């Protein structure tokens, strides 16, 4: 298996949060574009069920799999993350922006080399497991750290039937053993069920786009509104159309 190319940590200017030897840190990485309640719910589930000391939200500069999606500036996403990550055990960080590559394997290799006495666990939602085989060197991620997958509405069956889940089926641990997952040598992963949040970054972006379009439509001069143009062209066709409401 191809290994991650690792530059010695001392040569990299990235500064992740402090972690003391012996601590167990959960890593939730992503573009957080934007962050939402489900991110916090996933983190708190992992904190409680795995007995983690902290969860780091690793806010990436961009997602290689979502190049066509508009990504808000990193500083803006960091600000939003801090406003949502109200749990004192959740730490928001953007150190990945200072790493040579944006891939998870490189991030994990850097952290493990920098803090060899800290136990790291990768956290992700079931929606990410469903498409995990699209990630760069995804198999390697499973061999580097234990992985916890937290259920997401409508994604359980797709996640558990995914290529990644099938490839590492023998490494799956019962949910009842979640408390010992961080101490289990990789590859090892478990699937957590529990309270769910329907929030998603995609849905939030789509809603914002729709709202923007509606605002733009209302801002059009009255003579540019489609129904007015239609009436001007054919009065008979719009005889039953009521007058436009005030403020339109």
Residue locations for each model-derived region?
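Nucleotidyltransferase catalytic core that binds NTPs
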Residues: 1-248
